Amino acid sequence: MTYNHHYSINLLKKMLEIYSPSGKEKNLSSFLFNEFESTRFERVWMDKAGNVYGEIGSGTPAVLLCGHMDTVPGWIPVKIEGGKLFGRGAVDAKASLAAMISAALNLESEMSRGKIIVACVVDEEGKGKGIKQLIHENISVNYAIFGEPSGIKNITFAYKGHLKLKISCKTMTGHVGAQHLLPNAIEKGFELWNKIKNICEQKYKSPFGIFYSLTPTLVGISSRRTTGSIPDKCTLNIDLRLPPTINCRKAMKIIGNLIEDFRKENYGLTVNLRVTNRVEPYVARRDTIVVKALKEAIFEEIGEEAKLLRKTGTGDMNIFGTYFKIPVATYGPGNSTLSHTFNEYINIKEYLTSIKIYKRAVKKILESACRT
């Protein structure tokens, strides 16, 4: 079978037609498992988290190509229009994963040494269950490329970390007519949020830009429904993005101290803090064979120098790179400003070019590693 442009476009289209928000990747896992078994992958397996792996070649060096199957919720009708392929995950990040699969299949006949492992992981948009299981699988690799929308001319080498916080404020309740006597939990919750926002802006805003700043986002606020009573509970859900200078432990100390001071200022107020997810910030080295190979491949395919990016989001590279400490980078087609929107699409020409770039880069990594 020839893994040409038609195959690659059709593969991505089928992947987009299988709706796979975090926690519901089973159908896409099954599809890719069967696809891998029917193509040139020599070894195919699925782990207990639902990650799917395909292996080509053997021995060392070993290159991991890792992309995620899950998306944020929200179905988008799949269609091709004006050279664009629309669908949920077209940018983030099924195009990257499909391009990696196509690149690996097209490299199989050109490999003399080494191996490629393509990993299709679950829950990247959630709590990272997939990449954590991949680490537990004890896969032995020397280099890794992660598939996320950097844009065709760019390579991502750094991501911020994050803390997902759930903070609850509890007060005494009473008749709404006594609002002048009783504290309102919703108002207290919002006061606390403003203190968190202000301390980040005043003490942890970097002159070097948002990547180096501690940045909070209020992503949810809720309260108990009351009838004629003062609200006595308010819950804040906060996404705190961490620069490389502030790890999770330091960020927790900052927020914990602020909450303790807030408690002292508000007698009778109970404040509880819970961390629902944490990922450390990560900065990969820029002088590795992986970054060099991607830069050369981009220049050879499109005739322009690659730009190295620091991103304010968080990716599976954070968790993997922190654990394995091997050369890594993130690369993939797509305009990341379209991620998680209802106008998500991939430029088909860019997608096809990214396959060539992945292929060139992996070939360079394998050849260079074999020479050393």
Regions found by a protein language model. Name each.
Residues 32, 97-107, 134, 189-192, ...:
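Buried hydrophobic packing segments
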Residues 48-49, 67-69, 122, 147-150, ...:
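Fold-independent oxyanion-binding glycine-rich loops
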Residues 63-65, 119, 143-145, 327-329:
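Hydrophobic/aromatic beta-strand patches that form the interior of the parallel beta-sheet core
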Residues 98-164, 370:
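Acidic/histidine-rich catalytic neighborhood of metal-dependent amide-processing enzymes
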